[in-house]
A protein has these predicted regions:
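Conserved alpha/beta enzyme-core scaffold
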Residues: 1-374, 378
């Protein structure tokens, strides 16, 4: 028997002594544990109650289903039914499909909104004074930084996932169901999952453990809820992610590609990001032809990823894809099937608090609804 008291400086060592933290061996089989000892909760209402959500707290959502999302409306409807008030809604973005939130703002269920974008009737009503408190808009990278720093504290994150196992390993697609719903990358959800006090994964497709590969690991998930409907993947490719045939937008795209080339940024091993919007997405088509003509390739493409970028990767024109959001179903399929199509978090993508992938870009093509160009100041 070792006499601990005789060991020199023993009292300067914290938590010294025999280890008493060992748990009794669980002799149940894997199948039995998966059935009985998991994170599955019988209903959304029960999961909400278990989180301890209270009036005045902050709830978050991702927008990877874009205009096909059904999670936000379903959850806020339930919260209203349960009597919650004065909640802050912190979604990574809000689309036209979220117009039903208007009545929940009018009824005091939602009193604050923090997001990165807002469209449709909800945006129109907010612009006309629907909500008393100013809406906080952040860039996607700014939102990730605010969550990481604690400026945006999330009490409960409600994260829709096209596949999840009983322990919470969740992903934006399923390898067990070729025909199932898919949204591709869960990049914006990953930051919420990491820093939220409570995380509820809502899925329509429960798979056996382990759901590998996963976007969100089980140790970041508190509860898993099964539902019949999380969203319509056809809504992913809508509005800002459309393919354009507009002659004006095509002219803008062609000109942008020419400017990139003339500026010296189209070289062998360059890096790029293509944003949403018809002209922005069309620019990739013109760049592709220039790359083929000049026999050059792109080292990596970043950001919201389209099937067009995925096709260029499969052609060998792009070495790596860093995907924070899949803009269409072809991109989601590529993420599932292509080894060098990587899923990244919003923090990895563009947080100013850490070294981010945007810092390595040669150029970015983005589309804006409105640009104000002022006259230069004359002295």
């Amino acid at each position: 028997m070792i006499e601990l008291e005789k060991i020199p400086h023993i009292h300067e060592i914290s938590n010294h002594g025999p280890y008493h933290g060992a748990r009794e061996k669980n002799t149940a089989t894997f199948q039995a544990r998966s059935t009985r000892q998991n994170k599955l909760v019988p209903s959304l209402e029960e999961a909400i109650r278990r989180t301890g959500l209270k009036d005045g707290m902050t709830i978050s959502f991702h927008h990877h289903f874009r205009n096909g999302d059904h999670i936000i409306n379903t959850v806020v409807d339930k919260l209203a039914e349960m009597g919650y008030k004065n909640l802050t809604l912190a979604a990574s973005s809000l689309a036209a499909v979220h117009a039903p939130l208007i009545r929940h703002i009018q009824n005091g269920v939602i009193t604050h909104i923090e997001t990165s974008g807002m469209r449709g009737e909800l945006a129109e009503q907010v612009s006309r004074g629907l909500i008393d408190c100013p809406v906080v808009f952040r860039s996607h990278g700014g939102r990730a930084s605010a969550i990481r720093s604690g400026d945006l504290h999330i009490d409960v994150a409600f994260l829709g996932a096209p596949s999840c196992d009983p322990y919470g390993n969740a992903n934006g697609y399923s390898r067990d169901d070729e025909d199932g719903i898919a949204c591709g990358s869960l990049g914006y959800a990953r930051t919420d999952a990491t820093y939220a006090d409570n995380v509820i994964v809502i899925t329509n497709h429960l798979v056996a453990y382990p759901n590998a590969p996963w976007a969100i690991p089980e140790f970041e998930v508190d509860y898993v809820v099964m539902t019949d409907d999380i969203g319509d993947p056809k809504g992913i490719m809508s509005g800002a992610t459309r393919y354009t045939k507009d002659p004006k937008e095509l002219l803008i795209a062609k000109t942008a590609a020419n400017v990139i080339e003339a500026a010296g940024y189209l070289y062998d091993g360059f890096s790029m990001q293509m944003g949403s919007g018809g002209a922005s997405l069309a620019t990739a088509r013109f760049l592709r032809q220039k790359m083929i003509d000049q026999n050059i390739h792109c080292r990596f493409a970043l950001g919201g990823i389209t099937g067009q970028i995925a096709a260029m990767h499969e052609e060998g024109l792009i070495d790596r894809i860093l995907d924070v959001q899949s803009f269409d179903l072809d991109a989601a399929k590529s993420l599932k099937n292509n080894h060098f199509h990587h899923q990244i978090s919003a923090s990895y993508y563009a947080s100013h608090m850490v070294a981010a992938a945007v810092d390595q870009l040669d150029f970015v093509i983005l589309s804006l609804s409105l640009i104000h160009i002022s006259e230069p100041t004359r002295h």
